[in-house]
């Protein structure tokens, strides 16, 4: 077991705790309304409630979407930090898992596509975290439009890879868990998108709740990689970064595969 096992768990714990902290700050600063509030008005008078308590009158501008919670300081600063740190950790997890599957001689287009979608998800998170929806709406929506579909595709691809590589009952149990998480992510993401395009306050609030469930669900999915990351080593990262031709080369005098580019002349002649 290596310290890498803590990386996926840290991503889940740090990000989930962080976004709920951002939400709490936004509610206390009257920037959004609580998730339990389903009553919205067309307009509101100045809120007489003191800072530190939730708003007593809400409009559609106060729907507690995750992005909306991180739109204004001071919570926007924490939101950007979470987005940046989360994006880095997501990219690192994707790269390590890609290299780990290569070490197991599981070379497939699914693994490569999963790496691409995971890194695309990370890039989208960077944009979402640094361009707040109320200040750079177009860029924020572009980032969200990249991050959410890419994250969902990454989840689905790794469900397939989990079933493909299952050799023990516990492997199958993890694959089942990931399948359940993938289904939940798909349903909530679709519902969130469908509800979000409507002007109804009830549907807008429903979109916010679905978005929260979807994001937390995907973060939990990333956390499940701790199951495999106990076997990750520094060589795993080397395997992920190794040029493709070198992975199939064998060192002289050995029957085992080497990560060094010590190929036979016949292989070089084919290039």
Swiss-Prot record:
Its main location: membrane. It is a multi-pass membrane protein. Residues 1-2, 97-108, 162-178, 233-271 are cytoplasmic. Glycans are attached at residues 37, 41. Residues 24-75, 130-140, 200-211 are extracellular. It is found in: Cell membrane. Keywords: Cell membrane, Glycoprotein, Membrane, Transmembrane, Transmembrane helix. The chain crosses the membrane at residues 3-23, 76-96, 109-129, 141-161, 179-199, 212-232. GO terms for biological process: phosphatidylinositol phosphate biosynthetic process; protein localization to plasma membrane. GO terms for cellular component: plasma membrane. Interacts (via C-terminal cytoplasmic tail) with PI4KA. Belongs to the DRAM/TMEM150 family. Regulates localization of phosphatidylinositol 4-kinase (PI4K) to the plasma membrane, possibly by reducing the association of TTC7 (TTC7A or TTC7B) with the PI4K complex. Acts as a regulator of phosphatidylinositol 4-phosphate (PtdIns(4)P) synthesis. May also play a role in fasting-induced catabolism. This is Transmembrane protein 150A. The lineage of its organism: Eukaryota, Metazoa, Chordata, Craniata, Vertebrata.
């Amino acid at each position: 077991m290596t310290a890498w096992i803590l990386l996926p768990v840290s991503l889940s714990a740090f990000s989930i705790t962080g976004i709920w902290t951002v939400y709490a700050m936004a509610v206390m600063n009257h920037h959004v309304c609580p998730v339990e509030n389903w009553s919205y008005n067309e307009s509101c008078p100045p809120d007489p409630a003191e800072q530190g308590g939730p708003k007593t009158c809400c409009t559609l501008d106060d729907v507690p979407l995750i992005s909306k919670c991180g739109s204004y300081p001071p919570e926007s600063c924490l939101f950007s930090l979470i987005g940046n740190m989360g994006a880095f950790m997501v990219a690192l997890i994707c790269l390590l898992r890609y290299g780990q599957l290569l070490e197991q001689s599981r070379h497939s287009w699914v693994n490569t596509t999963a790496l691409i979608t995971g890194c695309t998800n990370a890039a989208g998170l960077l944009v979402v975290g640094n361009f707040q929806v109320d200040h750079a709406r177009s860029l924020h929506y572009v980032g969200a439009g990249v991050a959410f579909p890419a994250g969902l595709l990454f989840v689905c691809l790794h469900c397939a890879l989990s079933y493909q590589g299952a050799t023990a009952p516990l492997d199958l149990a993890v694959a089942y868990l990931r399948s359940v998480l993938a289904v939940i992510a798909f349903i909530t993401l679709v519902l969130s998108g469908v509800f979000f395009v409507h002007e109804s306050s009830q549907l807008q609030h429903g979109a916010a709740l679905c978005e929260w469930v979807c994001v937390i669900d995907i973060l939990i999915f990333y956390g499940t990689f701790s199951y495999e990351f106990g076997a990750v080593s520094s060589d795993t990262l080397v395997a992920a970064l190794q040029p493709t031709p070198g992975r199939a080369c064998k060192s002289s005098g050995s029957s085992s595969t080497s990560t060094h580019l010590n190929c036979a002349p016949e292989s070089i002649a084919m290039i």
